[in-house]
Amino acid sequence: MDTITVVENVFGEVERKVQKSYWEEHSKDLTVESMMLDSRAKDLDKEERPEVLAILPSYAGKTVLELGAGIGRFTGELAKEAGHVIALDFIDSVIKKNEEINGDIYKNITFMCADVTSPELKIEDNSVDIVFSNWLLMYLNDEEVEKLIGRIVKWLKPGGHIFIRESCFHQSGDSKRKVNPTHYREPRFYTKVFKECHSYDQEGNSFELSLVTSKCIGAYVKSKKNQNQICWLWEKVKCTEDKGFQRFLDNVQYKSTGILRYERVFGEGYVSTGGFETTKEFVDKLDLKAGQKVLDVGCGIGGGDFYMAETYDVHVLGIDLSINMVSFAIERAIGRSCSVEFEVADCTTKEYAENTFDVIYSRDTILHIQDKPALFRNFFKWLKPGGKVLISDYCRSPGTPSEEFAAYIKQRGYDLHDVKTYGKMLEDAGFHDVVAEDRTDQFLRVLERELGETEKNKEAFLADFTQEDYDDIVNGWSAKLKRSSAGEQKWGLFIATK
Protein backbone atom coordinates (compact mmCIF):
# COMPACT_ATOMS: atom_id res chain seq x y z
CA MET A 1 0.00 0.00 0.00
CA ASP A 2 1.52 3.35 -0.97
CA THR A 3 1.80 6.43 1.27
CA ILE A 4 -1.08 8.30 -0.40
CA THR A 5 -3.47 5.40 0.14
CA VAL A 6 -2.45 5.12 3.81
CA VAL A 7 -3.03 8.86 4.36
CA GLU A 8 -6.43 8.71 2.60
CA ASN A 9 -7.48 5.75 4.76
CA VAL A 10 -6.42 7.53 7.96
CA PHE A 11 -8.28 10.73 7.02
CA GLY A 12 -11.31 8.67 6.01
CA GLU A 13 -11.36 6.82 9.33
CA VAL A 14 -11.03 10.08 11.28
CA GLU A 15 -13.84 11.65 9.20
CA ARG A 16 -16.19 8.74 9.90
CA LYS A 17 -15.46 8.82 13.65
CA VAL A 18 -16.08 12.58 13.81
CA GLN A 19 -19.34 12.34 11.86
CA LYS A 20 -20.57 9.37 13.90
CA SER A 21 -19.79 11.16 17.16
CA TYR A 22 -21.60 14.28 15.89
CA TRP A 23 -24.76 12.38 15.02
CA GLU A 24 -24.72 10.27 18.19
CA GLU A 25 -24.68 13.58 20.09
CA HIS A 26 -27.60 14.98 18.06
CA SER A 27 -29.60 11.74 18.12
CA LYS A 28 -30.11 11.55 21.88
CA ASP A 29 -33.59 13.01 21.36
CA LEU A 30 -35.10 11.12 18.45
CA THR A 31 -37.33 13.97 17.29
CA VAL A 32 -37.83 15.85 14.05
CA GLU A 33 -36.18 18.87 15.74
CA SER A 34 -32.97 16.92 16.42
CA MET A 35 -32.94 15.40 12.93
CA MET A 36 -33.44 18.78 11.21
CA LEU A 37 -31.32 20.65 13.80
CA ASP A 38 -33.93 23.40 13.95
CA SER A 39 -36.40 24.59 16.60
CA ARG A 40 -38.98 25.29 13.86
CA ALA A 41 -38.60 21.81 12.39
CA LYS A 42 -42.27 20.82 12.63
CA ASP A 43 -43.43 23.81 10.58
CA LEU A 44 -40.57 23.47 8.08
CA ASP A 45 -41.24 19.75 7.70
CA LYS A 46 -44.91 20.41 6.99
CA GLU A 47 -43.93 22.80 4.17
CA GLU A 48 -40.91 21.08 2.66
CA ARG A 49 -41.86 17.39 2.79
CA PRO A 50 -44.59 17.62 0.11
CA GLU A 51 -42.36 19.96 -1.91
CA VAL A 52 -39.49 17.45 -1.93
CA LEU A 53 -41.72 14.48 -2.75
CA ALA A 54 -43.30 16.41 -5.64
CA ILE A 55 -39.88 16.71 -7.29
CA LEU A 56 -39.46 12.93 -7.50
CA PRO A 57 -40.48 10.92 -10.56
CA SER A 58 -43.20 8.32 -10.01
CA TYR A 59 -42.02 5.67 -7.56
CA ALA A 60 -45.22 3.60 -7.58
CA GLY A 61 -44.23 -0.06 -7.41
CA LYS A 62 -40.52 0.86 -7.68
CA THR A 63 -37.49 -0.06 -5.58
CA VAL A 64 -36.30 2.96 -3.60
CA LEU A 65 -32.99 3.12 -1.71
CA GLU A 66 -33.10 5.82 0.97
CA LEU A 67 -29.64 6.80 2.18
CA GLY A 68 -29.44 8.62 5.51
CA ALA A 69 -33.05 7.74 6.28
CA GLY A 70 -32.98 9.08 9.84
CA ILE A 71 -36.09 8.50 11.94
CA GLY A 72 -38.19 8.18 8.80
CA ARG A 73 -39.48 11.61 7.82
CA PHE A 74 -39.58 10.42 4.22
CA THR A 75 -39.46 6.64 4.68
CA GLY A 76 -43.17 6.19 5.36
CA GLU A 77 -44.15 8.59 2.57
CA LEU A 78 -42.02 6.64 0.09
CA ALA A 79 -43.38 3.30 1.32
CA LYS A 80 -46.99 4.38 0.66
CA GLU A 81 -46.43 3.96 -3.09
CA ALA A 82 -43.11 2.16 -3.61
CA GLY A 83 -42.85 -1.56 -4.17
CA HIS A 84 -39.86 -1.83 -1.84
CA VAL A 85 -38.00 0.75 0.27
CA ILE A 86 -34.53 0.08 1.65
CA ALA A 87 -34.05 2.57 4.51
CA LEU A 88 -30.44 2.94 5.59
CA ASP A 89 -28.77 4.98 8.33
CA PHE A 90 -25.45 4.63 10.18
CA ILE A 91 -26.79 5.39 13.68
CA ASP A 92 -28.36 2.26 15.19
CA SER A 93 -30.79 4.04 17.54
CA VAL A 94 -32.02 6.22 14.67
CA ILE A 95 -32.82 3.41 12.25
CA LYS A 96 -34.49 1.48 15.10
CA LYS A 97 -36.72 4.51 15.76
CA ASN A 98 -37.54 4.60 12.04
CA GLU A 99 -38.54 0.94 12.20
CA GLU A 100 -40.60 1.59 15.34
CA ILE A 101 -42.49 4.40 13.54
CA ASN A 102 -42.93 2.78 10.12
CA GLY A 103 -42.22 -0.95 10.43
CA ASP A 104 -45.66 -2.07 11.62
CA ILE A 105 -47.54 0.16 9.16
CA TYR A 106 -45.54 -0.67 6.01
CA LYS A 107 -44.37 -4.22 5.34
CA ASN A 108 -42.43 -3.24 2.21
CA ILE A 109 -39.53 -1.58 4.08
CA THR A 110 -36.14 -3.15 4.78
CA PHE A 111 -34.30 -1.33 7.59
CA MET A 112 -30.49 -1.36 7.55
CA CYS A 113 -27.88 0.08 9.90
CA ALA A 114 -24.87 0.72 7.67
CA ASP A 115 -22.38 3.40 6.67
CA VAL A 116 -22.71 4.39 3.00
CA THR A 117 -18.92 4.70 2.74
CA SER A 118 -18.27 1.13 3.89
CA PRO A 119 -17.08 -1.34 1.23
CA GLU A 120 -19.07 -3.93 3.19
CA LEU A 121 -22.33 -2.29 2.05
CA LYS A 122 -23.44 -4.51 -0.80
CA ILE A 123 -26.20 -3.37 -3.16
CA GLU A 124 -26.68 -5.30 -6.37
CA ASP A 125 -25.86 -3.46 -9.62
CA ASN A 126 -28.88 -2.32 -11.69
CA SER A 127 -31.28 -3.19 -8.85
CA VAL A 128 -32.61 0.20 -7.73
CA ASP A 129 -35.07 2.56 -9.47
CA ILE A 130 -34.57 5.61 -7.24
CA VAL A 131 -31.84 6.57 -4.79
CA PHE A 132 -33.15 9.17 -2.35
CA SER A 133 -30.80 11.15 -0.13
CA ASN A 134 -31.82 14.11 2.03
CA TRP A 135 -28.85 15.74 3.84
CA LEU A 136 -26.19 13.07 3.49
CA LEU A 137 -23.32 14.11 1.21
CA MET A 138 -22.54 17.13 3.41
CA TYR A 139 -21.45 14.64 6.08
CA LEU A 140 -18.92 12.97 3.76
CA ASN A 141 -15.54 14.31 2.68
CA ASP A 142 -14.91 15.09 -1.00
CA GLU A 143 -13.35 11.73 -1.80
CA GLU A 144 -16.18 9.86 -0.07
CA VAL A 145 -18.75 11.82 -2.09
CA GLU A 146 -17.05 10.95 -5.39
CA LYS A 147 -16.74 7.25 -4.52
CA LEU A 148 -20.34 7.01 -3.31
CA ILE A 149 -21.76 8.64 -6.46
CA GLY A 150 -19.76 6.16 -8.54
CA ARG A 151 -21.30 3.27 -6.59
CA ILE A 152 -24.81 4.72 -6.75
CA VAL A 153 -24.69 4.93 -10.55
CA LYS A 154 -23.87 1.22 -10.65
CA TRP A 155 -26.72 0.38 -8.26
CA LEU A 156 -29.24 2.26 -10.40
CA LYS A 157 -31.11 0.66 -13.26
CA PRO A 158 -30.76 2.45 -16.62
CA GLY A 159 -33.42 5.18 -16.56
CA GLY A 160 -33.28 5.24 -12.76
CA HIS A 161 -33.02 8.47 -10.78
CA ILE A 162 -30.92 9.99 -7.99
CA PHE A 163 -32.38 12.69 -5.76
CA ILE A 164 -30.03 14.55 -3.43
CA ARG A 165 -30.63 17.56 -1.20
CA GLU A 166 -27.84 19.35 0.66
CA SER A 167 -27.18 22.44 2.77
CA CYS A 168 -24.73 24.61 0.83
CA PHE A 169 -22.59 27.61 1.86
CA HIS A 170 -23.63 27.72 5.55
CA GLN A 171 -25.88 26.07 8.14
CA SER A 172 -29.63 26.68 8.12
CA GLY A 173 -30.83 25.19 11.39
CA ASP A 174 -30.72 27.19 14.63
CA SER A 175 -29.75 24.30 16.94
CA LYS A 176 -26.70 24.96 19.11
CA ARG A 177 -23.70 22.79 18.17
CA LYS A 178 -20.48 22.32 20.17
CA VAL A 179 -18.71 21.34 16.98
CA ASN A 180 -19.98 21.24 13.42
CA PRO A 181 -18.11 18.93 11.02
CA THR A 182 -20.60 19.52 8.19
CA HIS A 183 -19.13 20.28 4.75
CA TYR A 184 -21.03 23.34 3.49
CA ARG A 185 -19.95 23.28 -0.14
CA GLU A 186 -20.81 25.40 -3.14
CA PRO A 187 -23.56 23.74 -5.25
CA ARG A 188 -21.25 23.59 -8.27
CA PHE A 189 -19.09 21.00 -6.42
CA TYR A 190 -21.99 18.52 -6.42
CA THR A 191 -23.00 19.39 -9.98
CA LYS A 192 -19.45 18.76 -11.19
CA VAL A 193 -19.12 15.40 -9.41
CA PHE A 194 -22.41 14.15 -10.84
CA LYS A 195 -21.72 15.44 -14.36
CA GLU A 196 -18.30 13.77 -14.45
CA CYS A 197 -19.48 10.38 -13.18
CA HIS A 198 -19.55 7.50 -15.70
CA SER A 199 -20.11 3.77 -15.34
CA TYR A 200 -19.97 0.75 -17.65
CA ASP A 201 -22.05 -2.41 -17.74
CA GLN A 202 -20.80 -5.91 -18.60
CA GLU A 203 -21.55 -5.34 -22.29
CA GLY A 204 -19.32 -2.26 -22.31
CA ASN A 205 -22.18 0.26 -22.54
CA SER A 206 -21.31 3.62 -21.00
CA PHE A 207 -23.74 5.43 -18.69
CA GLU A 208 -23.77 8.95 -17.28
CA LEU A 209 -26.08 11.18 -15.27
CA SER A 210 -28.35 13.69 -16.98
CA LEU A 211 -29.74 16.56 -14.91
CA VAL A 212 -33.53 16.61 -14.73
CA THR A 213 -33.77 19.59 -12.38
CA SER A 214 -31.97 21.48 -9.65
CA LYS A 215 -33.58 24.06 -7.38
CA CYS A 216 -33.68 25.85 -4.06
CA ILE A 217 -36.09 24.34 -1.56
CA GLY A 218 -38.93 26.87 -1.63
CA ALA A 219 -40.01 26.25 1.97
CA TYR A 220 -36.70 27.67 3.21
CA VAL A 221 -36.88 30.64 0.86
CA LYS A 222 -40.39 31.47 2.07
CA SER A 223 -39.80 30.94 5.80
CA LYS A 224 -36.15 31.99 6.16
CA LYS A 225 -35.37 33.82 2.88
CA ASN A 226 -32.61 31.25 2.61
CA GLN A 227 -31.49 29.86 -0.77
CA ASN A 228 -28.83 27.48 0.55
CA GLN A 229 -31.04 24.37 0.59
CA ILE A 230 -30.35 22.91 -2.86
CA CYS A 231 -31.65 19.72 -4.43
CA TRP A 232 -30.83 17.89 -7.65
CA LEU A 233 -32.63 15.18 -9.60
CA TRP A 234 -30.47 13.16 -12.01
CA GLU A 235 -31.34 10.34 -14.42
CA LYS A 236 -29.01 7.48 -15.38
CA VAL A 237 -28.82 7.52 -19.18
CA LYS A 238 -26.76 5.86 -21.88
CA CYS A 239 -23.95 8.10 -23.13
CA THR A 240 -24.70 9.67 -26.50
CA GLU A 241 -22.85 12.04 -28.79
CA ASP A 242 -25.76 14.50 -28.90
CA LYS A 243 -25.75 16.17 -25.48
CA GLY A 244 -28.80 18.33 -26.16
CA PHE A 245 -29.59 22.02 -25.90
CA GLN A 246 -28.75 22.32 -22.20
CA ARG A 247 -25.17 21.13 -22.85
CA PHE A 248 -24.95 23.55 -25.79
CA LEU A 249 -25.89 26.44 -23.53
CA ASP A 250 -23.48 25.45 -20.75
CA ASN A 251 -20.55 24.45 -22.96
CA VAL A 252 -20.88 26.92 -25.85
CA GLN A 253 -23.04 30.00 -25.38
CA TYR A 254 -23.13 30.30 -21.61
CA LYS A 255 -19.89 28.82 -20.31
CA SER A 256 -18.95 30.15 -16.86
CA THR A 257 -16.34 32.53 -18.27
CA GLY A 258 -18.79 33.64 -20.96
CA ILE A 259 -21.40 34.48 -18.33
CA LEU A 260 -18.93 36.53 -16.33
CA ARG A 261 -17.79 38.51 -19.35
CA TYR A 262 -21.44 39.16 -20.32
CA GLU A 263 -22.00 40.40 -16.78
CA ARG A 264 -19.00 42.72 -17.10
CA VAL A 265 -20.71 44.34 -20.09
CA PHE A 266 -24.34 44.36 -18.87
CA GLY A 267 -23.60 45.20 -15.23
CA GLU A 268 -23.48 43.27 -11.96
CA GLY A 269 -26.21 40.62 -11.81
CA TYR A 270 -27.33 41.02 -15.42
CA VAL A 271 -26.86 39.13 -18.70
CA SER A 272 -29.49 40.83 -20.87
CA THR A 273 -29.73 44.06 -22.85
CA GLY A 274 -29.32 47.24 -20.83
CA GLY A 275 -28.78 45.55 -17.47
CA PHE A 276 -30.27 47.43 -14.52
CA GLU A 277 -31.41 50.44 -16.58
CA THR A 278 -33.84 48.53 -18.82
CA THR A 279 -34.81 46.20 -15.96
CA LYS A 280 -35.96 49.12 -13.81
CA GLU A 281 -37.78 50.75 -16.74
CA PHE A 282 -39.64 47.58 -17.71
CA VAL A 283 -40.38 46.23 -14.21
CA ASP A 284 -41.80 49.60 -13.16
CA LYS A 285 -44.47 49.14 -15.87
CA LEU A 286 -45.84 46.07 -14.07
CA ASP A 287 -47.27 47.87 -11.01
CA LEU A 288 -46.07 45.07 -8.74
CA LYS A 289 -47.66 44.72 -5.29
CA ALA A 290 -46.20 43.20 -2.13
CA GLY A 291 -46.86 39.47 -1.85
CA GLN A 292 -47.40 38.88 -5.57
CA LYS A 293 -45.77 35.88 -7.25
CA VAL A 294 -43.55 36.39 -10.30
CA LEU A 295 -42.17 33.76 -12.70
CA ASP A 296 -38.97 34.83 -14.48
CA VAL A 297 -38.40 32.65 -17.56
CA GLY A 298 -34.71 32.68 -18.46
CA CYS A 299 -33.66 34.30 -15.18
CA GLY A 300 -29.94 34.30 -15.98
CA ILE A 301 -27.84 35.14 -12.92
CA GLY A 302 -30.71 36.70 -11.02
CA GLY A 303 -30.18 40.48 -11.05
CA GLY A 304 -33.70 41.30 -12.19
CA ASP A 305 -35.20 38.90 -9.67
CA PHE A 306 -33.30 40.45 -6.77
CA TYR A 307 -34.44 43.90 -7.94
CA MET A 308 -38.12 42.86 -8.04
CA ALA A 309 -38.03 41.07 -4.67
CA GLU A 310 -36.10 43.77 -2.82
CA THR A 311 -37.90 46.76 -4.36
CA TYR A 312 -41.49 45.48 -4.45
CA ASP A 313 -41.49 42.71 -1.79
CA VAL A 314 -42.73 40.11 -4.28
CA HIS A 315 -41.83 36.40 -4.34
CA VAL A 316 -39.89 35.51 -7.49
CA LEU A 317 -39.29 32.08 -9.00
CA GLY A 318 -36.48 32.26 -11.55
CA ILE A 319 -36.01 29.38 -13.99
CA ASP A 320 -33.27 28.84 -16.55
CA LEU A 321 -32.16 25.87 -18.63
CA SER A 322 -28.49 26.71 -18.07
CA ILE A 323 -27.01 25.01 -15.00
CA ASN A 324 -24.20 27.57 -15.02
CA MET A 325 -26.63 30.50 -14.93
CA VAL A 326 -28.62 29.08 -12.01
CA SER A 327 -25.42 28.20 -10.11
CA PHE A 328 -24.31 31.83 -10.31
CA ALA A 329 -27.80 33.06 -9.36
CA ILE A 330 -27.91 30.90 -6.23
CA GLU A 331 -24.42 32.01 -5.21
CA ARG A 332 -25.42 35.68 -5.65
CA ALA A 333 -28.56 35.13 -3.55
CA ILE A 334 -26.67 34.09 -0.43
CA GLY A 335 -26.87 36.75 2.26
CA ARG A 336 -29.42 38.93 0.45
CA SER A 337 -32.41 37.77 2.55
CA CYS A 338 -34.89 38.21 -0.28
CA SER A 339 -37.75 35.99 -1.39
CA VAL A 340 -36.24 34.57 -4.58
CA GLU A 341 -35.86 30.92 -5.52
CA PHE A 342 -34.08 29.47 -8.54
CA GLU A 343 -34.51 26.28 -10.53
CA VAL A 344 -32.86 24.62 -13.51
CA ALA A 345 -35.87 23.93 -15.70
CA ASP A 346 -37.00 23.78 -19.33
CA CYS A 347 -39.90 26.20 -19.77
CA THR A 348 -41.22 24.11 -22.69
CA THR A 349 -41.73 21.01 -20.50
CA LYS A 350 -42.23 22.55 -17.05
CA GLU A 351 -45.76 22.46 -15.66
CA TYR A 352 -47.42 24.76 -13.15
CA ALA A 353 -50.97 24.80 -11.84
CA GLU A 354 -53.44 27.16 -13.49
CA ASN A 355 -53.68 30.66 -12.00
CA THR A 356 -50.35 30.41 -10.13
CA PHE A 357 -48.56 33.66 -11.02
CA ASP A 358 -49.42 37.35 -10.97
CA VAL A 359 -46.67 38.19 -13.47
CA ILE A 360 -44.57 36.25 -15.99
CA TYR A 361 -41.40 38.10 -16.94
CA SER A 362 -38.82 37.16 -19.58
CA ARG A 363 -35.84 39.05 -20.93
CA ASP A 364 -34.18 38.14 -24.25
CA THR A 365 -34.76 34.41 -23.74
CA ILE A 366 -37.73 33.23 -25.80
CA LEU A 367 -35.68 33.69 -28.98
CA HIS A 368 -34.38 30.19 -28.13
CA ILE A 369 -37.90 28.67 -28.16
CA GLN A 370 -39.07 27.16 -31.46
CA ASP A 371 -42.75 26.69 -30.54
CA LYS A 372 -43.66 30.08 -29.10
CA PRO A 373 -47.46 29.70 -29.50
CA ALA A 374 -47.44 26.61 -27.23
CA LEU A 375 -45.35 28.44 -24.63
CA PHE A 376 -47.61 31.50 -24.72
CA ARG A 377 -50.67 29.28 -24.20
CA ASN A 378 -48.96 27.91 -21.09
CA PHE A 379 -48.15 31.42 -19.89
CA PHE A 380 -51.84 32.29 -20.26
CA LYS A 381 -52.83 29.20 -18.28
CA TRP A 382 -50.28 29.78 -15.49
CA LEU A 383 -51.25 33.45 -14.96
CA LYS A 384 -54.02 34.50 -12.61
CA PRO A 385 -56.92 36.46 -14.17
CA GLY A 386 -55.69 40.03 -14.55
CA GLY A 387 -52.09 38.83 -14.51
CA LYS A 388 -49.52 40.33 -16.85
CA VAL A 389 -46.77 39.03 -19.09
CA LEU A 390 -43.76 41.20 -19.98
CA ILE A 391 -41.26 40.02 -22.58
CA SER A 392 -38.30 41.66 -24.26
CA ASP A 393 -36.84 39.66 -27.12
CA TYR A 394 -34.78 39.67 -30.26
CA CYS A 395 -36.91 40.05 -33.38
CA ARG A 396 -36.31 40.58 -37.10
CA SER A 397 -37.72 42.68 -39.90
CA PRO A 398 -40.54 41.18 -42.04
CA GLY A 399 -39.48 39.31 -45.16
CA THR A 400 -36.56 37.04 -45.95
CA PRO A 401 -33.36 37.66 -43.94
CA SER A 402 -30.02 38.14 -45.72
CA GLU A 403 -27.69 35.14 -46.02
CA GLU A 404 -25.43 36.55 -43.31
CA PHE A 405 -28.29 37.16 -40.85
CA ALA A 406 -29.85 33.76 -41.66
CA ALA A 407 -26.49 32.09 -40.91
CA TYR A 408 -26.31 33.93 -37.56
CA ILE A 409 -29.86 32.83 -36.64
CA LYS A 410 -29.06 29.22 -37.56
CA GLN A 411 -25.74 29.16 -35.69
CA ARG A 412 -27.42 30.44 -32.53
CA GLY A 413 -30.46 28.18 -32.89
CA TYR A 414 -32.79 31.19 -32.66
CA ASP A 415 -36.42 31.44 -33.78
CA LEU A 416 -37.03 35.10 -34.65
CA HIS A 417 -40.22 36.89 -35.77
CA ASP A 418 -41.11 40.44 -36.66
CA VAL A 419 -42.59 42.54 -33.85
CA LYS A 420 -46.15 42.52 -35.21
CA THR A 421 -46.21 38.72 -35.66
CA TYR A 422 -44.81 38.26 -32.15
CA GLY A 423 -47.61 40.37 -30.69
CA LYS A 424 -50.19 38.45 -32.73
CA MET A 425 -48.96 35.18 -31.21
CA LEU A 426 -49.71 36.57 -27.75
CA GLU A 427 -53.20 37.62 -28.88
CA ASP A 428 -53.81 34.17 -30.37
CA ALA A 429 -52.86 32.62 -27.00
CA GLY A 430 -55.76 34.52 -25.41
CA PHE A 431 -54.07 37.68 -24.10
CA HIS A 432 -55.76 41.10 -24.20
CA ASP A 433 -54.41 44.66 -24.30
CA VAL A 434 -51.31 43.44 -26.13
CA VAL A 435 -48.62 46.10 -26.48
CA ALA A 436 -46.01 45.20 -29.12
CA GLU A 437 -43.34 47.90 -29.37
CA ASP A 438 -40.34 48.06 -31.69
CA ARG A 439 -37.56 49.12 -29.29
CA THR A 440 -34.71 48.83 -31.81
CA ASP A 441 -33.72 52.50 -31.42
CA GLN A 442 -33.28 51.92 -27.70
CA PHE A 443 -31.40 48.67 -28.46
CA LEU A 444 -28.96 50.61 -30.66
CA ARG A 445 -28.35 53.24 -27.97
CA VAL A 446 -27.72 50.56 -25.36
CA LEU A 447 -25.39 48.60 -27.65
CA GLU A 448 -23.38 51.73 -28.43
CA ARG A 449 -23.07 52.58 -24.74
CA GLU A 450 -22.08 49.03 -23.75
CA LEU A 451 -19.53 48.78 -26.55
CA GLY A 452 -18.10 52.21 -25.73
CA GLU A 453 -17.73 51.34 -22.03
CA THR A 454 -16.03 48.05 -22.89
CA GLU A 455 -13.54 49.73 -25.23
CA LYS A 456 -12.87 52.54 -22.75
CA ASN A 457 -12.18 50.02 -19.96
CA LYS A 458 -10.19 47.58 -22.10
CA GLU A 459 -7.27 47.43 -19.68
CA ALA A 460 -9.47 46.52 -16.71
CA PHE A 461 -11.34 43.95 -18.84
CA LEU A 462 -8.08 42.28 -19.90
CA ALA A 463 -6.97 42.08 -16.27
CA ASP A 464 -9.82 39.60 -15.67
CA PHE A 465 -10.39 38.08 -19.12
CA THR A 466 -8.41 37.13 -22.23
CA GLN A 467 -7.84 39.04 -25.44
CA GLU A 468 -10.08 36.47 -27.13
CA ASP A 469 -12.87 37.28 -24.66
CA TYR A 470 -12.46 40.99 -25.37
CA ASP A 471 -12.47 40.45 -29.13
CA ASP A 472 -15.59 38.25 -28.90
CA ILE A 473 -17.48 41.00 -27.06
CA VAL A 474 -16.33 43.84 -29.31
CA ASN A 475 -16.94 41.87 -32.51
CA GLY A 476 -20.28 40.53 -31.26
CA TRP A 477 -21.58 43.98 -30.25
CA SER A 478 -20.29 45.53 -33.49
CA ALA A 479 -22.09 42.84 -35.50
CA LYS A 480 -25.34 43.44 -33.59
CA LEU A 481 -25.01 47.17 -34.23
CA LYS A 482 -24.47 46.54 -37.94
CA ARG A 483 -27.47 44.17 -38.26
CA SER A 484 -29.74 46.46 -36.25
CA SER A 485 -28.63 49.64 -38.05
CA ALA A 486 -29.35 47.91 -41.36
CA GLY A 487 -32.89 47.19 -40.14
CA GLU A 488 -32.50 43.40 -40.08
CA GLN A 489 -32.22 42.67 -36.36
CA LYS A 490 -34.94 44.16 -34.17
CA TRP A 491 -35.65 44.31 -30.46
CA GLY A 492 -39.22 44.09 -29.21
CA LEU A 493 -41.00 44.82 -25.95
CA PHE A 494 -44.31 43.02 -25.33
CA ILE A 495 -46.79 43.51 -22.50
CA ALA A 496 -50.14 41.73 -22.30
CA THR A 497 -52.88 40.94 -19.80
CA LYS A 498 -54.93 37.83 -19.03
Curated annotation (Swiss-Prot):
One GO BP on record is: phosphatidylcholine biosynthetic process
| Outcome of mutating G298D | No effect on catalytic activity
* Pfam families (alphabetical): Methyltransf_25, Methyltransf_31
Binding of N-methylethanolamine phosphate, residues:
Q253, Y254, Y262, Y394, Y408, R412, G413, Y414, K480
MF (Gene Ontology): N-methyltransferase activity; phosphoethanolamine N-methyltransferase activity
Give the pathway annotation. Answer: Phospholipid metabolism; phosphatidylcholine biosynthesis; phosphocholine from phosphoethanolamine: step 1/1
Q: What class of enzyme is it?
A: transferase
Q: Where does S-adenosyl-L-homocysteine bind?
A: G68, R73, D89, D115, V116, N134, V271, S272, G298, D320, D346, C347, R363
What the entry lists under InterPro entries is as follows: Methyltranfer_dom, Methyltransf_25, Phosphoethanolamine_N-MeTrfase, SAM-dependent_MTases_sf
Q: Does the keyword Transferase apply?
A: yes
* Reactions catalysed: phosphoethanolamine + S-adenosyl-L-methionine = N-methylethanolamine phosphate + S-adenosyl-L-homocysteine + H(+); N-methylethanolamine phosphate + S-adenosyl-L-methionine = N,N-dimethylethanolamine phosphate + S-adenosyl-L-homocysteine + H(+); N,N-dimethylethanolamine phosphate + S-adenosyl-L-methionine = phosphocholine + S-adenosyl-L-homocysteine + H(+)
Q: Which UniProt keywords apply?
A: Methyltransferase, Transferase
- UniProt keyword Methyltransferase, yes or no: yes
Record-listed E.C. numbers: 2.1.1.103
Listed binding positions for phosphocholine are S167, S172, G173, R177, Y184, Y262, Y394, Y408, R412, Y414, K480
TM segments?
A: none
Q: Which SUPFAM superfamilies match?
A: S-adenosyl-L-methionine-dependent methyltransferases
The family this protein is said to belong to? Belongs to the class I-like SAM-binding methyltransferase superfamily. PEAMT family.
Function field = Involved in phosphocholine biosynthesis. Catalyzes the N-methylation of phosphoethanolamine, phosphomonomethylethanolamine and phosphodimethylethanolamine, the three methylation steps required to convert phosphoethanolamine to phosphocholine (PC).
**What's the name of the protein?**
Phosphoethanolamine N-methyltransferase 1
From which source organism is this entry? Triticum aestivum
